[in-house]
């Protein structure tokens, strides 16, 4: 069974088609904002920083970036490194997702381990189930970069990648930061938000209890749990589009 066949049933789960369409519309509209048509590099850069700050905060890190000096909080520093690397990593994500995930772990966790542990960064936990499910996820991502992409909406693709990485916690640390970054890569790669303007991470930060509980429901594998997670992710994308509009409005004013 290929990626398209395995994910197609998810597209038709209760509430998913409507949530996908609403998210798509919100993202399309923010891409038409005058600031995003002419100066999208500026708004995308601000979106990337806001995403990194929110993702670090969800993981328990600092939110604010010091006006002077360097970032000392290891989670925020790692999240900012991840954000800076997403653009260059996009081709690797589409071609060799496991390599991209390894790189994300190196960047996110670099300040959390001592010099004698640096070599283990980028290596998933030695667990047979983790290895097999990561391989399956990688095959799914690479297949979705081909013909299956048009058949499986970007919000569904991103929700599956995001939820599976949260459930697996493949590295044992900073897995949430990695999962959110991988979801962001998927949203961009799928063509849903090719400029990286949307900031769903802010919604995850503001709704942390719902985020965590719905992710657990996804990991259960139940039909209701998977549908709840996908629709939650769609609502977060919609909220992320509102955040993107606020960025664009501030740039234009």
Question: Residue ranges of each PLM-predicted region?
Answer:
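FIC/Doc superfamily catalytic core
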Residues: 1-253
């Amino acid at each position: 069974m290929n990626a398209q066949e395995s994910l197609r049933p998810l597209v038709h789960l209760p509430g998913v088609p409507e949530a996908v369409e609403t998210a798509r519309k919100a993202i399309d509209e923010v891409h038409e904002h005058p600031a995003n048509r002419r100066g999208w590099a500026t708004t995308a850069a601000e979106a990337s920083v806001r995403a990194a700050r929110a993702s670090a905060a969800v993981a328990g890190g600092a939110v604010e970036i010091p006006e002077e000096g360097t970032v000392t909080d290891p989670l925020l520093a790692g999240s900012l490194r991840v954000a800076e690397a997403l653009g260059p990593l996009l081709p690797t994500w589409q071609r060799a997702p496991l390599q991209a995930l390894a790189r994300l772990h190196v960047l996110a966790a670099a300040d959390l381990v001592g010099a004698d542990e640096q070599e283990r960064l980028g290596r998933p936990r030695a667990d047979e189930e983790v290895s097999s499910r990561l391989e399956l996820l990688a095959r799914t991502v690479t297949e979705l970069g081909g013909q299956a992409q048009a058949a499986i909406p970007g919000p569904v693709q991103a929700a599956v990648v995001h939820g599976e990485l949260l459930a697996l916690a493949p590295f044992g640390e900073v897995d949430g930061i990695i999962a959110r970054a991988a979801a962001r890569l998927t949203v961009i790669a799928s063509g849903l938000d090719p400029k990286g303007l949307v900031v769903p991470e802010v919604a995850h930060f503001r709704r942390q209890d719902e985020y965590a509980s719905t992710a657990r429901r996804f990991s259960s594998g139940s039909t209701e749990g998977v549908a709840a997670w996908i629709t939650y992710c769609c609502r977060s994308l919609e909220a992320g589009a509102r955040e993107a509009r606020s960025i664009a409005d501030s740039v234009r004013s």
